[in-house]
Amino acid sequence: MSRRQARERALQILFQVDVGGADPGEAFRLMDEGFGELKKYQEFARLLVGGTLENLAAIDRVIAGVSKDWNINRMANVDRNIIRMALYEIFFCEDIPYSVSVNEAVELGKTYGGEESGRFINGILGRIVESPEEYRPLIKGSAS
């Protein structure tokens, strides 16, 4: 399993919580069952899911700030959760270069989203990484 596969698992959990109303604790338990001995990637997936959910309100403020003409709830469910997870990486995972977070999100969008998902995700995240300090105030003091 790679970090990309860990991101895929994290996306599945975020989607279940967001769209299916799954309990995060139960979702984590189900996610953990699929990792077996691959603890390094399990920890990364848990970090992405836990961090994204913990900072969801702030992350959604950033998305709303960038996509002024799009209500976040009107975005495709998969795209919304990919963007949320990527923004968690961008603002909270200092060891991951922005370009990696954006590229991984675009690839997830191409795999799991609609025909235009990759382009849409790249557009949203691209605007943010061009000037992340513009959006950082929306993140500060953000635990929801």
Curated annotation (Swiss-Prot):
Gene3D superfamilies per record: NusB-like
GO molecular function, one term: RNA binding
UniProt key word Lyase: no
Transmembrane residue ranges: none
Listed GO CC annotations: cytosol
Pfam families given in the database record: NusB (PF01029)
InterPro entries: NusB-like_sf (IPR035926), NusB_fam (IPR011605), NusB_RsmB_TIM44 (IPR006027)
Gene Ontology biological-process annotations: DNA-templated transcription termination; transcription antitermination
Keywords: RNA-binding, Transcription, Transcription antitermination, Transcription regulation
NCBIfam families referenced in this protein's UniProt entry, alphabetically: nusB (TIGR01951)
Cited function: Involved in transcription antitermination. Required for transcription of ribosomal RNA (rRNA) genes. Binds specifically to the boxA antiterminator sequence of the ribosomal RNA (rrn) operons.
Family of the protein in this entry: Belongs to the NusB family.
Protein name: Transcription antitermination protein NusB
